[in-house]
Amino acid sequence: GFYKSFPGYLVSLTGSDKNQENITLHVGSPGIRGEYYIWEKNDGGARYLFSQQEKIDSLNLNSYQAINYTASDGVKMQGWLLMPRSGNPKALVNYIHGGPHGPYVGFWFDWRMQAMAEMGYAVFAPNFRGSGGYGNNFERAGYTKWGTRMLDDMREGAEFVMENFDVGERVYTLGGSYGGYSSAQNVIRHN
């Protein structure tokens, strides 16, 4: 029940007492630095503890939009879109996470995405197959597909965004670690 209360977010167990009757949970996404909740067995529910982002909220930064799309082979995908405040993006940045077997939806506040949006770019962060946080089958679907199907998922996500949002006519791709590798491979595979 608690996990279903936060669709599109990564909910993680962060601690428990030694009897595992009281646990703390973290809820995060690229736009939410982190909220903590405690679930107490005796109460049968969770209650809010605190947020890591009160100071960040005061900056009035751009908000993320969850994007759901279907890959050409029918697999459901999810990603995050961040639009610039100007409302007229110069181009779309397809921002690829590292790993690759780690979700883009994580505990951290992604200052890079906010910086790119402040510079006038629309930023899309796809959770392509192989990303963690969407179940074992979804993560395993990316095994041995680093330079093929996973790259197609990234491109198809960017194409979906371009078809459905005013993000300009150019697409740039970048990332670190596997994100950097896949950015280079995308140029080769998709010209």
Where are the regions a protein language model picked out?
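Serine-hydrolase catalytic core recognition
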Residues: 10-191
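Conserved phosphoryl-transfer catalytic core
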Residues: 2
